Amino acid sequence: MRLPVSFAQQRLWFLDQLTPGEPTYNLPSAFWLEGPLDARALQRAMDAMVARHAVLRTSIVGYGGVPEQVVADTGTVPIERIELPLGLDECELTQKAESIAVELARQPFDLAAAPLIRTALIVAGPDRHLFVLVVHHSICDGSSMKILIDELSAVYRAETAGVPASLPPLVMEYGDFAVWQRDRMRGEELDRQLGYWRERLRGAPQLLTLPADRPRPARRTSRGGLATTYVDAATTQRLAAVARGANCTMFTVFLTGFAATLSRYAPQADTLVGTAVSDRTHSELDPLIGLFTNTLALRMSMADDPAFTELLGRVRDTTADALAHKQLPFEKLVADLAPDRTLAHTPLIQAQFDYGSLASPTLDLPGITTRSLELSTSTAKLDLTVYADAHDAHDAQVTRLSMEYSADLFDAAWADRFLGYMTTLLEHAAAAPGTPLADLPMLTAAQRVEPRNPVEATLATIWVDLLDTRAPVGVHDNLFALGGHSLTATRFVARVGDAYGVQLPVRQVFVSPTIAELAGVVAAHPDFSVTKGSSRLTELDALSDDDLDALLRAALAQRNRRRSG
């Protein structure tokens, strides 16, 4: 049977045509299973899932350049049994099994060949298995993965107990949703939705400019990485209180923190941030497996250096308005706005924030102890996507922050710094939510180091004079995180040249964006000359550590007086 694709499926098919053979949109899950597993019952449960959900028998095939869903009447997803070599100890077995799981997660799918799902059972011992499940995003999303795993567990339990499984009836299939979605997005409803988004995004920037480790290539790839950190339980609790006080959700609070951190990196007060929302608007869709997510383009304004609470209110209102108009498929929006199309970056949105996206569903099998194993495909859909989700740790709830980042642009250290800055900013915002964004520190007091030598002191003095910030400056502070931008970097390089006779490329500031890093570059430069600014250096050499600290604070105070005047 041939059916129309949904708008989201259409976009994924197009991306697959553009860069075939990529695992970017693979959704992997894996579970360590300890106990007497009935592998045959697990296979029967998987067969029942394929029979129940037509989308698991679906491929996406192009006919004359137009993709369609092709649904097979029957199908099977065999669980591949992988026996590990003999003679390995438990640690080696674990490493080997998890290595195979990663390989399975990264194997691409051919969208024209159903099923777009693969499973494997890696045998690491008589009662020890690693179950791997990989589904392509074109037929599944995060909530659908939970449905699949929950129902797989329910049928397995029924099979091992010798009773029929009790599952909610399906009154429609995903193909019906795709037909309904296309019928809905026509005429007056389409005009109403487009009218809102046209007005909301009028004049919005098409590109988020972030200081990167490398120039943006002419054609982006899906190479990516994953970085993770945690917001501690105390800060999470304080942020929950901030959310209650602002009559908003934790999603809004963390989205505000993400937007605030971006604003300290990007030289623009107007930013588009994407977020994923569910298009399950009717109860009949609740038990279905399929791709029901849509992307909203949220326009964030950091103009006039708002306090965190003020920005929180802006984000809350922006999000509420967007959710009231969430039915317009992102693909329709892009087609209507027709931004400049380029292979260098994704259209409209290069940064995204999602809340709760990494919560792992759990296999619940009788007599089996289950432990989830998170797998990464080492890919990135955008320049950066930050996920936040509640995470239990030592009987307390913390918040896990994970960043999927483009390896075309950023190194792992860049991603770690960004998450660290975001975490510190949130900690200070939780303690003093009325603080203006520019005054929220992004380094902890322990991380902030005062200049340790005359070169660092000189660069810090220049820095303080150029940057529009009232926050203290340390040698590990990031120029761009403090509000610097391309023009600031250009002026900084010129001032450094005046002081030391070195001609640094402006790009060096992007590559080495801290005082400590730049001081090392300046001192190692072949044209470095202490005589160029000898009087200044002699003066600095004579200063004690306390005097250097006072000099920097005086420069900072002078800068603040100019701002307030």
State each model region's role.
Residues 20-26, 54-55, 127-128, 182-194, ...:
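His-Asp-centered acyl/peptidyl-transfer active-site segments
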Residues 15-24, 168, 190-248, 338, ...:
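Flexible, P/S/T/G-rich "lid" or insertion loops adjacent to the active sites of thioester-utilizing
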